[in-house]
């Protein structure tokens, strides 16, 4: 194993062993990253300190900002590999791909960028999986505002994400009247009312021929009833909707209300994120394609990253990193150590080229 791969393997394994789910104490991993940054001569700044903090470190002025999140989803059961176990060049463990691999690449790249005196900034958040409040706070930092490009180091197999679909998560509730199931005429069944509403939305739940370019809708949770012999007085479903940039959350809600009418239910927005779109012909995007070499392509993804929280400053925003998104949150999550090393090299070259072009 060469020196770069050894460095990657050491940092990634240490990050993986520092547990960072929503239930874990986040301080150990924040302290670990802060110490790494301080040893490079950087001075970490903290945002959202009363919650799950975001760390920003800056070297020089107006450099590319690299961003990643240190938190993970829970581990889960039935894994075939131990945490941070490496087999045939792949390291296994929760967070290896999503996205401590990307954070490792950022830290390794930072060491080289400091050595060659290229301006850059880093942002590490700790609540991407549970709300993105840290990213929202970090978006106000001066490094974010000055960056010519923001590059989120999430796993993309080194494709360049320039578009993300919007997210709208809703709670839909119907009410009825409770009664003994032997006398349904005395009650009003909330589940039956919900069934009628969902039938009006059924065609929206069918997967379109091109899911990336169209709205998709999933009914993912349902709650109703208390006992088999009691007419249910309430029924509630949670709905997840992803929509393309040509739509807005307002137009999606209007579409739903047109289908199901304006009464007979309660509708509540649980969470929403706007779609994000970056012009693939921007110089900052073309420069990244240059660095990645032949075969590099820009893509659209159906999910959201913290890129959505960073928009609004006029800088180019992209997602690009090592690892396969399909293994994120899965059992036996893993990432190639050599891929993380390649990502570090890509980030160094990209920051260097962007610095030369913006001087």
Show where each model-derived region lies.
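Acidic-glycine-rich active-site phosphate/pyrophosphate-binding loop
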Residues: 71-87, 146-147, 162-173, 318
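Phosphate-handling active-site elements
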Residues: 87-89, 109-122, 146, 201-210, ...
């Amino acid at each position: 194993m060469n020196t770069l791969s050894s460095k990657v393997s050491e940092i990634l394994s240490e990050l993986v062993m520092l547990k960072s789910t929503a239930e874990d104490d986040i301080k150990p991993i924040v302290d670990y990253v802060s110490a790494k940054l301080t040893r490079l001569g950087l001075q970490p700044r903290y945002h959202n300190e009363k919650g799950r903090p975001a760390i920003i470190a800056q070297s020089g002025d107006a450099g590319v900002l690299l961003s990643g999140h240190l938190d993970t989803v829970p581990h889960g059961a039935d894994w075939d590999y131990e945490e941070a176990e490496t087999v045939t060049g792949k390291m296994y463990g929760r967070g290896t791909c999503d996205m401590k691999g990307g954070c490792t690449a950022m830290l390794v790249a930072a060491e080289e960028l400091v050595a060659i005196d290229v301006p850059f900034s880093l942002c590490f958040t700790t609540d991407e999986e549970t709300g993105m409040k840290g990213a929202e706070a970090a978006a106000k930092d001066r490094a974010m505002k000055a960056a010519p490009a923001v590059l989120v180091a999430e796993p993309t197999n080194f494709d360049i994400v320039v578009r993300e679909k919007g997210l709208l998560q809703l709670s839909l509730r119907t009410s009825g009247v409770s009664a003994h199931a032997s006398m349904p005429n005395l009650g009003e069944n909330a589940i039956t009312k919900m069934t009628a509403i969902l039938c009006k939305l059924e065609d929206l739940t069918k997967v379109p021929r091109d899911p990336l370019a169209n709205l998709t809708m999933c009914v993912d949770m349902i709650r109703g009833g208390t006992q088999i012999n009691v007419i249910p007085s309430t029924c509630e479903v949670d709905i997840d909707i992803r929509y393309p940039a040509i739509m807005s959350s307002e137009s999606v809600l209007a579409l739903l209300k047109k289908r199901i009418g304006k009464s007979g239910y309660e509708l509540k927005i649980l969470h929403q994120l706007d779609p994000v779109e970056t012009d693939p012909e921007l110089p900052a995007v073309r420069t990244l394609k240059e660095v990645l070499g032949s075969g590099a392509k820009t893509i659209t993804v159906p999910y959201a990253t913290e890129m959505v929280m960073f928009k609004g400053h006029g800088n180019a925003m992209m997602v690009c990193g090592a690892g396969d998104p399909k293994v994120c949150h899965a059992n036996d999550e893993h990432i190639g150590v050599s891929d993380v090393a390649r990502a570090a090299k890509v980030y160094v070259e990209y920051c260097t080229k962007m610095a030369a072009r913006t001087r």
